[in-house]
Amino acid sequence: MRILWIVAVCLIGVEGNLFQFAKMINGKLGAFSVWNYISYGCYCGWGGQGTPKDATDRCCFVHDCCYGRVRGCNPKLAIYAYSFKKGNIVCGKNNGCLRDICECDRVAANCFHQNQNTYNKNYKFLSSSRCRQTSEQC
């Protein structure tokens, strides 16, 4: 019960893009799927280093690179327009950086969906000591 309360408090404080990204992931993969990607491999979650462990981890690497190219707003906080149409994520009428962030998130959510078969439970909560190789360039 205490853990549920902590999770609820954390989610109440989540605004903007990261919450929208989570909703995209859940929309493509099913309710609560986002929890599978919060700390996975070397790149899913905060930060990232080393070589992606599999195609799922590479989705996060590419997403990190995409966020790194966004200029003009904070990708983790900005709120953009999007919707689901027939199971597809459609970015709305966003301008500039909001459009770019939405596209980063849309591509990553689709990538997770397309690479579900590579998901390896052994990479969930992977120790950072297993991600010490030289990081790839974006």
UniProtKB/Swiss-Prot annotation:
Names of required cofactors: Ca(2+)
Activity regulation (record text): Enzymatic activity and neurotoxicity are inhibited by Triton X-100, which has been determined to be located in the center of the hydrophobic channel of the enzyme.
Sample GO molecular function, one term: phospholipid binding
Active-site residue numbers: 63, 105
GO biological process: arachidonate secretion; lipid catabolic process; negative regulation of T cell proliferation; phospholipid metabolic process
Tissue specificity statement from the Swiss-Prot or TrEMBL entry: Expressed by the venom gland.
Pfam families attached to this UniProt entry: Phospholip_A2_1
Binding annotation for Ca(2+): 43, 45, 47, 64
UniProt-listed Gene3D superfamilies: Phospholipase A2 domain
Record's cofactor remark: Binds 1 Ca(2+) ion.
Statement: the UniProt record of this protein carries the keyword Secreted: yes
Signal peptide bounds: 1-16
Alphabetical keyword list: Blood coagulation cascade inhibiting toxin, Disulfide bond, Hemostasis impairing toxin, Hydrolase, Metal-binding, Neurotoxin, Platelet aggregation inhibiting toxin, Presynaptic neurotoxin, Secreted, Signal, Toxin
EC number: 3.1.1.4
Entry coiled-coil feature ranges: none
Intrachain disulfide bonds: 42-131, 44-60, 59-111, 65-138, 66-104, 73-97, 91-102
Gene Ontology cellular component annotations, sorted alphabetically: extracellular region
Domain of life (superkingdom): Eukaryota
UniProt similarity note: Belongs to the phospholipase A2 family. Group II subfamily. D49 sub-subfamily.
Subunit structure: Heterodimer; non-covalently linked. The toxic basic protein has phospholipase A2 activity (chain HDP-1P) and the non-toxic acidic protein functions as its inhibitor (chain HPD-1I (AC A4VBF0)).
Role noted for this protein: Heterodimer: shows the same activities as the monomer, but with a lower potency. Monomer: snake venom phospholipase A2 (PLA2) that shows presynaptic neurotoxicity, anticoagulant activity and that weakly inhibits ADP-induced platelet aggregation. Inhibits exocytosis in pancreatic beta cells, confirming it can act presynaptically in inhibiting the exocytosis of neurotransmitters in neurons. PLA2 catalyzes the calcium-dependent hydrolysis of the 2-acyl groups in 3-sn-phosphoglycerides.
Record's protein name: Basic phospholipase A2 chain HDP-1P
Source organism (scientific name): Vipera nikolskii
